[in-house]
């Protein structure tokens, strides 16, 4: 699982090599594939991953074009406001970041974030483990704390977690907040930016296990 390529094709090739080395069953990408680039650039960044013929599930980040949220990329599954089953796991996704004073490319209001999460979860199959793939982390955790000690995650995502209790949430966005935390029984993972060599490896079978590694 990776996040925040920010246009680094080198990081994409390293991610593909890591997936091969670890015999990964799937690759999860939590947004900021580009650094204010086009859908075509996002497709080029994802190409080393889709070439592995593994499931590649992604959401767009706030530094990606909003059009990426609707884009169909060959060999990859766009999870934005969608649910996708793999084995015994339902993956649901939400791209973007909460609206902010920075006015980045792809932002959503907290109201829209909560509505989108709830509606997407309703479309996921019952009886499966539920995994949320989000660009933004939930608010008030170890993994959304900025260098200036501001918790910059989504309050709506936190509300969703408290209500729906997914098994695990994969996220990114806050580069300096690499780590693993919990909200209740839900595991929250921000691996740190893959552009700087970070990733997470997760086993989602009977007992969920997560470890932070380097690509």
Annotate each language-model stretch with its function.
Residues 1-3, 27-32, 56-62, 78-80, ...:
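Active-site neighborhood of phospho(di)ester-bond hydrolases with catalytic His/Asp-centered motifs
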Residues 6-10, 34-39, 62-69, 99-103, ...:
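Active-site environment of divalent metal-dependent phosphoester hydrolases
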Residues 7-86:
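Core catalytic region of metal-dependent phosphoesterases/phosphodiesterases
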Residues 15, 44-48, 116, 153-160, ...:
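A general structural detector for well-ordered alpha-helical segments in enzyme core domains, enriched
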Residues 20, 64-156, 214:
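Conserved catalytic scaffold of divalent metal-dependent phosphoesterases
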Residues 71, 84-87, 108, 155-164, ...:
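Binuclear metal-dependent phosphoesterase catalytic core
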């Amino acid at each position: 699982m990776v996040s925040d390529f920010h246009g680094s094709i080198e990081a994409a090739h390293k991610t593909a090599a890591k997936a091969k080395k670890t015999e990964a069953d799937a690759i999860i990408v939590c947004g900021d594939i580009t650094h204010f680039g086009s859908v075509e650039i996002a497709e080029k960044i994802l190409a080393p991953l889709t070439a592995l013929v593994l499931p590649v599930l992604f959401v767009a980040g706030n530094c990606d074009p909003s059009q990426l949220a609707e884009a169909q990329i060959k060999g990859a599954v766009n999870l934005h406001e969608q649910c996708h089953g793999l084995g015994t796991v339902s993956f649901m996704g939400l791209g973007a970041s909460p609206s902010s004073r920075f006015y980045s490319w792809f932002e959503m209001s907290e109201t829209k974030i909560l509505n989108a999460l709830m509606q997407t979860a309703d479309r996921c199959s019952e009886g499966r483990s539920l995994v949320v793939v989000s660009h933004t982390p939930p608010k008030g955790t170890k993994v959304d704390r900025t260098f200036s000690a501001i918790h910059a995650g989504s309050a709506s995502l936190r509300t969703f977690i408290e209500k729906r209790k997914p098994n695990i949430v994969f996220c990114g966005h806050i580069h300096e907040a690499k780590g693993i935390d919990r909200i209740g029984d839900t595991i929250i993972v921000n691996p740190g930016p893959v552009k700087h060599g970070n990733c997470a490896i997760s086993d989602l079978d009977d007992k969920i296990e997560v470890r932070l590694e380097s690509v």
